[in-house]
């Protein structure tokens, strides 16, 4: 009897919580999308991309435009080469 009662209570709890959790996940997804597309985050992404380009240019000794034309395997070899 206790097992059946526990099973029924768990099923009712799942049926009640599923819409609530769906609402939380929808809110979280909407908030994350708004944050990701905000002006501040766009500026930070731009700064991070520029920093990465400058790092690559410094590491391989080339300009960022030249570094973008190097094949991926060669690029990885250059990054891992330590004289």
From Swiss-Prot:
Signal sequence interval, chain numbering: 1-22
Keywords: Antibiotic, Antimicrobial, Fungicide, Ion transport, Membrane, Secreted, Signal, Target cell membrane, Target membrane, Transmembrane, Transport
Pfam families from the UniProt entry: Antimicrobial_7 (PF08102)
Annotated propeptide span(s): 66-83
Family: Belongs to the non-disulfide-bridged peptide (NDBP) superfamily. Long chain multifunctional peptide (group 2) family.
Function: Amphipathic peptide with potent activities against both Gram-positive and Gram-negative bacteria. Is the most active against the two Gram-positive Bacillus megaterium and Micrococcus luteus (MIC=4.0 uM for both). It has relatively low hemolytic activity against human erythrocytes.
Protein name: Heterin-1
Organism expressing this protein natively: Heterometrus spinifer (Asia giant forest scorpion)
